[in-house]
Swiss-Prot record:
MF annotations from Gene Ontology: ATP binding; ATP hydrolysis activity; ATP-dependent DNA damage sensor activity; damaged DNA binding; single-stranded DNA binding
Binding site for ATP: G68, P69, E70, S71, S72, G73, K74, T75
Localization of this protein: Cytoplasm
Function: Can catalyze the hydrolysis of ATP in the presence of single-stranded DNA, the ATP-dependent uptake of single-stranded DNA by duplex DNA, and the ATP-dependent hybridization of homologous single-stranded DNAs. It interacts with LexA causing its activation and leading to its autocatalytic cleavage.
Keywords linked to the UniProt accession: ATP-binding, Cytoplasm, DNA damage, DNA recombination, DNA repair, DNA-binding, Nucleotide-binding, SOS response
Any GO BP: DNA recombination
Family: Belongs to the RecA family.
Species of provenance: Chloroflexus aggregans (strain MD-66 / DSM 9485)
Record SUPFAM superfamilies: P-loop containing nucleoside triphosphate hydrolases, RecA protein, C-terminal domain
Protein name: Protein RecA
Pfam families linked: RecA, RecA_C
Top-rank lineage group of the source organism: Bacteria
GO cellular component terms given for this protein: cytosol
Length: 351
C-alpha cells in the first residue's frame, strides 16, 4: 500500500527538521544511499579466511576481535591486515599496550614500517584515548590494539601490588566502546582488538576458557575470530612455522561459524602461496596428480613446497590464480569454507 500524500509531506518535514537540527545525512531513505549499501572490506592476507568471512576480508567501519591461546598467530594476522590496508593506499596504526612490538617481524609480514603509526601507552585509558583520536581523524584505515589484557586502568597502575579492583577493566572497555562505536562507523576504520584467553576456575561443564575485558567487546564486535595452532610445521627436525585454524565465531556481515586453515611461517608470516595451493586444489583450479601439481595442462612442480617456491618466484602467475579463486569462491563461500563445529569444546565464555 502506497504512502498517502499527507504522510509523505509530514515525513519530509520531519526529515528536514532532523537534518537542520543534527546535520545533513542524520536520517535518509535506504533507497537513496545507492552504492554505499555494499560493505567494503580489507583483505586479511589469507585468501581462505577472506572466503570464510564471506565479503573478502574484515568489514570497514566495524570492531573486530581476534582471540586465541599464546603464540597462535593473533598479532601476525592483525599485522597482515595492516599490510593489506597499506597496499590499498591506507594508513595503519598499532597501539602496543603489551610493549612487545617487533618491527623486524612486522616487516616480514609485509607491513611498511616507515609509514606505520606506533604507540606504546602507559595506561589503558591512554591507549583508548589515542585510539579514539585516531578514529575521529578519519585518516586511519586500520587500528590494532594489542592487547585487551594489557589495557591496565590507571588506578591499578598507581595502586599497590595485590590491591583488589574487580571489574575496573571491564568498565573501562564498556565506556570506551560506547564512545567509539559511532565514530568507528562514520570513519570507516577497522578497529581490531587482540584478546587473550584465561581459564575459569571450577567449571564442570562446557569450556573453562574466557576472554579478558568483560562482556562489552563481545557485543560491540561485528566479527570475532578464534585462532588456534593445530600443527607445527617442520623442515627436517627444525620447526619453521605453524598451521593454524581460524573459526569465525561471530559475523554480523555474512553467515558465521565458517573456518579457514593456513600456514604461518617464521620468516614471512602467513604463507600466501601455500594458501593459494590449498584453496586452488580444493576448487579444482589447480589439479593434483600424484605428487605433481598442474594449472590446466601446465606443470607447476612436484611436491607442495616446490610449487610454493615456484609461485613465490612467479608473482604474476600467483596473482592470476588468486583472481580465479576469488571469482569462483566468493560467489559460494560455503563450498570452500566449511562450517566450524561450535560446541562445548569450542565455545568461549566471556567474563
Amino acid at each position: 500500500m502506497a504512502i498517502t500524500p499527507e504522510k509523505e509531506k509530514a515525513l519530509a518535514a520531519a526529515m528536514a527538521q532532523i537534518d537542520r537540527k543534527f546535520g545533513k545525512g542524520s536520517i535518509m531513505k535506504m533507497g537513496e544511499v545507492g552504492g554505499r549499501l555494499a560493505i567494503e572490506a580489507i583483505p586479511t592476507g589469507s585468501i581462505a579466511l577472506d572466503i570464510a568471512l564471506g565479503i573478502g576480508g574484515v568489514p570497514r567501519g566495524r570492531v573486530i576481535e581476534i582471540f586465541g591461546p599464546e603464540s597462535s598467530g593473533k598479532t601476525t594476522l592483525a599485522q597482515h591486515i595492516i599490510a593489506e590496508a597499506q597496499k590499498m593506499g591506507g594508513v595503519g596504526a598499532f597501539i602496543d599496550a603489551e610493549h612487545a612490538f617487533d618491527p623486524v617481524y612486522a616487516a616480514r609480514c609485509g607491513v611498511n614500517i616507515s609509514d606505520l603509526l606506533v604507540s606504546q601507552p602507559d595506561t589503558g585509558e591512554q591507549a583508548l584515548e589515542i585510539c579514539e583520536m585516531l578514529v575521529r581523524s578519519n585518516a586511519v584505515d586500520v587500528i590494532v590494539i594489542d592487547s585487551v589484557a594489557a589495557l591496565v586502568p590507571r588506578a591499578e597502575i598507581e595502586g599497590d601490588m595485590g590491591d583488589s579492583m574487580p571489574g575496573m577493566q571491564a568498565r573501562l572497555m564498556s565506556q570506551a566502546l560506547r564512545k567509539l562505536s559511532g565514530a568507528i562507523s562514520k570513519s570507516r576504520a577497522v578497529v581490531i582488538f587482540i584478546n587473550q584467553l584465561r581459564m575459569k576456575i571450577g567449571v564442570m561443564f562446557g569450556s573453562p576458557e574466557t576472554t579478558t575485558g568483560g562482556q562489552a567487546l563481545k557485543f560491540y564486535a561485528s566479527v570475532r575470530l578464534d585462532i588456534r595452532r593445530i600443527e607445527t610445521l617442520k623442515q627436517g627436525q627444525e620447526a619453521i612455522g605453524s598451521r593454524v585454524r581460524v573459526k569465525v565465531i561471530k559475523n554480523k556481515v555474512a553467515p558465521p561459524f565458517r573456518q579457514a586453515e593456513f600456514d604461518i611461517l617464521a620468516n614471512e608470516g602467513i604463507s600466501r602461496e601455500g594458501n593459494i595451493i590449498d584453496i586452488g586444489t580444493e576448487l579444482g583450479i589447480i589439479r593434483k596428480s600424484g605428487a605433481w601439481f598442474y594449472l590446466g595442462e601446465d606443470r607447476l612442480g612436484q611436491g607442495r613446497e616446490n610449487v610454493r617456491e615456484f609461485l613465490k618466484n612467479n608473482p604474476a602467475l600467483t596473482d592470476e590464480i588468486e583472481r580465479l579463486i576469488k571469482a569462483q569462491a566468493l560467489t559460494n563461500p560455503s563450498a570452500i569454507a566449511p562450517s566450524a563445529d561450535i560446541g562445548d569444546d569450542d565455545g568461549v565464555f566471556e567474563e
